[in-house]
Amino acid sequence: MRVQRVVMPGSGSESWTVVGDDHVPVAPVERFLAYLASIERSPNTVKAYAHDLKDWFSFLAVHGLDWQAVTLEHVARFVAWLRLPPAARDGRVSVLPTVEHHCGGASVNRKLAALASFCEFHARLGVPLAGLLVTMAPAGQGRSSVTSYKPFLAHIAKHTAQRRRAITLPAPVPRPQVLSAA
């Protein structure tokens, strides 16, 4: 499976698609990426989503899963699979616990965000994937603010449920480097 660049004849606009091992575009991914291009998402966003969904469909192919019948447990296994080095992803090589993760937390979270958008898009088309990666949490639960600042009209939305991702990895926040006097 690979990501292929597509240049539209006439307009010259650039897009991306995921091509399977049979050299045919993967239909559900192609439909989603065409939707992103039609609502004028950045070509870089379309390219990143194509790479992320290529990883998802590669995982599904390795494990013999149907994309329409996945569960949250499969997504958790996908996260663990992403953290493995590429040579160990086929399952024939064991990885020692001392080996560093291949994908960092921020990269995995971006891939999960792409997968959540993909599932939400297809849920609107009738595929039963709506609650796979997004849960509704009561308002006020979750991350607490360090300050007491509340935006104007915050009291209006305090009783509505908020969307939360079901799986999120901690991503280290990079610290700025200190400038030297020299």
Predicted features and spans:
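Contiguous hydrophobic segments
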Residues: 1-12, 104, 118-129, 180-182
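N-terminal core-binding DNA-recognition domain of tyrosine recombinases/integrases
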Residues: 30-44, 54-153
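Long, amphipathic, Lys/Arg-enriched alpha-helical "connector/arm" segment
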Residues: 92-96, 100, 147-182
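Short, flexible segments with low predicted structural confidence
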Residues: 17-21, 28, 46, 155-159, ...
